[in-house]
A protein has these predicted regions:
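Extended active-site neighborhood of metal-dependent phosphoesterases/phosphodiesterases
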Residues: 80, 85-200, 283-312
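Bacterial N-terminal signal peptides that target proteins for export
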Residues: 2-11
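Extracytoplasmic/secreted envelope proteins and their assembly/folding machinery
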Residues: 49-57, 83-91, 128, 132, ...
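A short C-terminal boundary segment appended to hydrolase-like catalytic domains
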Residues: 311-333
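N-terminal active-site segment of His-dependent metallophosphoesterases
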Residues: 27-85
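His/acidic metal-ligating clusters that form di-metal
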Residues: 58-67, 95, 168, 184-281
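Bacterial N-terminal signal peptides
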Residues: 10-22
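Structural recognition of the beta-strand scaffold that forms the well-ordered cores
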Residues: 35-39, 66-76, 100-105, 109-112, ...
Length: 333
């Protein structure tokens, strides 16, 4: 019996029960499923900051997730994007799971930092450079089997593995992916950087699906900040029309095409908009295996995080979702 107690509790349920503890609300079984945690659009207030740094942090530390993904917007839109605030929030997020936090930027911490309503305004391009230095100048120190990679020149785009499940982040933000309300920077320069980032995202997405065909992969999990379903019209952005267009439609079409070719479960996780919902029809008839999770946050009350059970062998329900503290399941989108 003592020998069995030393066996990792991530083994099948019969052995897990011998380890002396109760199973969490969403259980993790070895090899066939895994459980991850996402958080974002948080904190937007002092109350949410306190909740994240106390109750949420304790719950995350006790749940033994392999990592945490923060899907951006780590501050409220009305807070000035100062070095001090961004550094404090970076430290708070890192402390949720030291050395195991993946973060993709949100519009609140760079594209929207030039708003006239703010007490202190910043160039959005300067804030993006600051974020890249603050969060991504040093790669995470992860085990080799995670196959962790960052995209050259766009280090916020990351890719890693857990067994046969592939994860990646794409730097796509609100404000029409940074194409609207360029108030303090040269618009042509800002749009040129948006175009470069868009191209990098498309390359990173294609590379991830290529990798999934070359290595055993049973599911792909993609995280962005932006709600790709919340675009402006249906017209794609072009060099001759870079702003009065839908900044998400091109990557959305690419994602559906790649997911359809992959055939196995694909989940897009994002924040940016308020509904807490799981969209089983996001891929449409073209890619019924493509799901979309608008995760908890964006003034949802109370402050919480979203845990996801990934069970790729269940084609009808490959993703089971509920909040960490209150076990609230999402509605349909």
């Amino acid at each position: 019996m003592e020998l069995l107690r030393r066996i990792r509790c991530s083994l099948p349920v019969a052995i897990a029960l011998l380890c002396g503890g109760s199973l969490p609300a969403i259980a993790q079984t070895a090899q066939t499923t895994m459980r991850i945690l996402t958080i974002g659009d948080l904190p937007y207030s002092e109350a949410e900051e306190d909740e994240m740094n106390t109750t949420l942090r304790r719950a995350i530390h006790g749940a033994e997730f392999p990592f945490v993904i923060h899907y951006g917007d780590l501050k409220g839109g009305g807070e000035a994007c100062t070095d001090r605030l961004l550094t404090t929030r970076r430290n708070d997020i890192w402390n949720l799971h030291p050395g195991r936090v993946f973060y993709t930027p949100g519009d609140n911490e760079w594209t929207d930092c030039d708003r006239s309503s703010l007490t202190q305004r910043f160039s959005e391009l300067e804030r993006l450079n600051f974020l890249r230095q603050l969060f991504f100048s040093q790669p995470l120190d992860l085990p080799p089997e995670w196959d962790y990679q960052q995209q050259p020149l766009f280090p916020e785009n990351a890719r890693w593995r857990q067994g046969e499940i592939l994860f990646l982040t794409l730097h796509i933000v609100g404000t029409n992916n940074g194409r609207h309300e360029i108030l303090l920077d040269d618009p042509e320069m800002a749009i040129a950087q948006v175009e470069a980032r868009d191209q990098a995202n498309r390359v990173w997405l294609q590379t991830a699906f290529n990798d999934a065909t070359q290595q055993p992969t049973r599911a792909i999990i993609i995280t962005t900040q932006a709600d790709l379903s919340n675009g402006h019209g249906e017209e794609a952005c072009t060099p001759t029309n870079p702003t009065d267009c839908n900044g998400y439609v091109t990557i959305q079409k690419q994602l559906r095409t790649l997911a359809a070719q992959f055939e196995k479960p694909v989940l897009l996780i994002h924040g940016d908009t308020n509904p807490y919902c799981l969209d089983q029809g996001f891929g449409g008839t073209q890619a019924p295996n493509l799901w979309r999770l608008n995760a908890w946050g964006d003034f949802q009350n109370p402050a919480d995080a979203t845990q996801i059970l990934i069970q790729p062998d269940d084609r009808h329900q490959p993703f089971v979702v509920q909040t960490l503290l209150h076990q609230q399941a999402p509605e349909g989108c």
